[in-house]
Amino acid sequence: PNGCGKSTLLSHLYRLHPSKNKITLNEKPLESYKGREFAQLVAVLTQSRDAMIDDFLVKDIVLMGRYPYKQHFGTYSSEDVKIAEHYMNEVGITHLSNEEIHHLSGGEKQRVFIAKALTQKPQILLLDEPTNHLDMKYKVALMKQLRAFKGTTIVVLHDLNLAAQYCDHIVIMNNGTILKEGSPTEVLTPEILEPIFEVPFKTSWDEGRYHLYY
């Protein structure tokens, strides 16, 4: 539910230091990674956007995903440009490449930043509500793309049916606490969800897919 601590938990995974204990990546404390090294491993999509890039072109923002690989004072390589163009095509924004981002709709902007994260070619994607502002076509396309991603994806979602259909492992949170984690069918049950959301739930299988109704 809203305000349960999902975004805060995610932020700790991209180097917001916890007040106690440690978080490790590949058995190495997060705080020991240098910025460039960490950015080559982890790409992040947050809910906030930097207003300083409002006048940037779409293609330039997506190309920023290659920044962790750029040599000091160097320019982006032809391979960097090729990678950026590939992911712009993947998320359906090639036709917007020469537009300034402040001219775009919310859904179009979201796809730009998703393309930027993918252009980073990380091992891990951290995505905070990536389906926000997207219509159903692009929600489904994004989730299929994330399923095909070769690394690890950690995503905050409010759409429980999308989570049921595309996620392997689900963590349910409430009031800053992890209540339950496991497979979709283990976690997304009326017994667990009804006390949290205070609405009745039903579940069913349809053509091999697990669905929730409320």
Predicted regions and their residues:
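Helix-to-loop junction immediately C-terminal to a conserved catalytic motif
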Residues: 13-14
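Conserved ABC ATPase signature
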Residues: 75, 100-104, 108
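Conserved ABC transporter NBD signature motif
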Residues: 21-31, 38
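ABC ATPase nucleotide-binding domains
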Residues: 190, 194-214
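Conserved ABC ATPase "signature" region
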Residues: 63, 78-96
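Catalytic Walker B motif of ABC-type/P-loop ATPase nucleotide-binding domains
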Residues: 125-129
